[in-house]
Amino acid sequence: MSSLKNWDNKTWLSSLKYIQKFNNFLLNQKKLNQNSIILDIGCGRGKIIGSLYKKIKFKKKPIGIDIESHKDIDKNMIFKKQNAVSFLNQTKKNFDLILIKQTIHLLEINEIIRLLNICKKKLTISGKIFIFSLDPYKNEIPTFKLMKRKINNSLKRDKKIFKLIKKLDFSLIEKKFSYKVNISKIKYTDMIKKKYISTLLNFTDKQIFTGIKEINTRYNKKLIFNDKLICLILSK
């Protein structure tokens, strides 16, 4: 599979309003202070943990790891272009919060189990793992037909992943996060062109072009919908 480069590249996911709401959600679920140590697995450009650093004023910058590097990475984090398992096996740090946002579905089942078991060993006593993924039951993402079919197949797999995680040896709480998106159709089709979501990564240029034509026909000039996520909060 191609790497996911544009999920936080000038999208609502990288907007100040989204990041503020997301970080407020995190802080309502997990108390953090200046001494907290943070890790973001699949951090993208690191805007979320970079904003969290400025808000809390951590003594140590959060660490973000991703297999894709960008020129516009947030300066308020330490970025490592590395596989998550490799990093966790090498580091001597323990973390108060490990964030895995809309990344877990990209892994094979055995990789998920291995990753979470290592993450557990790297938690502080009160540390927590936050796993975010699209809500498979109430998804409102605007789509064209082929995209919809691919997303539905992906969400079916997500349900299986959730069931698997719930069987692992963790204390687990399930929460929901929702953000109301208000975006122009022109901006959204540009995001589709840039393949902002993993579902689109293997689509051909022709499939993307046809899909955009379908979006232009089906939807109004302004798209308003809820971006809904399931959040699994794991602790020892």
Question: Model segments located where?
Answer:
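A short glycine-rich, Lys/Arg-flanked "PGG" loop and its adjoining helix->strand segment in the class I
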Residues: 113-125
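Short alpha-helix
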Residues: 154-169
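Short catalytic micro-motifs in class I SAM-dependent methyltransferases
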Residues: 102-103
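Conserved Class I S-adenosyl-L-methionine
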Residues: 173-236
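A conserved beta-strand element that flanks and buttresses the S-adenosyl-L-methionine
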Residues: 99
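Conserved class I S-adenosyl-L-methionine
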Residues: 1-33, 47, 51, 130-156
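Class I SAM-dependent methyltransferase SAM/SAH-binding core
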Residues: 39, 44-87
